[in-house]
Amino acid sequence: LQIIAGDLTLDSHREAILQWVDSQWGGIDVLVNNAGIGAIGRFDEATQDRLRQVMEVDFFAPVELTRLCLPWLRKGNRAAILNVGSVLAHRAVPNKSEYCAAKFAIRGWSESLRVELAKEGIDVLMLSPSTTRSEFFDSLVDTNPQEKSRSVGSMSSDRVAQLAVSALVRSKREMILSVGGRALVWAGRLFPRLTDRLLSRFA
């Protein structure tokens, strides 16, 4: 295992990482887009920078990294792109509007890219975990510390990683990982007005 630190929002850092990967392994079979940040708080109380930061890291960075990786993936063995989204890519909730917007964007882009690359044999998969126990909440943008302390993950990062490997092995186009997540998504689809009313209690 080798780790390279870098800012994926910068073109130069993305290119440097790809050059290093090419020098070490000469190609890419699987790209996992998992870098992300979030924010908690009402939209009307947030700064413009909060939305831009979240979108840069959670949407534009993985999109542009994927663009750079495509030449290698086209030559890869059972090539796949795994985009780590969220349950909130399927059903938005209050006080996380920027994060929901970024994850909805990732999901839409993934669906389009999946069809575009299908004939080339490159799988595009979408993994949608619920809240995960990780250092994610240590880097929330423009968020009240009290909100951070209330953010408790329901699934370990190790378990999410295991399910990600399973999705890759099975070429599972989309996985919502938790029972609670699937319940929220289906409630939003079947009973949208009721779901809105229930969620508004947390706004």
Model-based region annotation:
Residues 5-16, 48:
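The beta1-alpha1 cofactor-binding region of Rossmann-like NAD(H)/NADP(H)-dependent oxidoreductases
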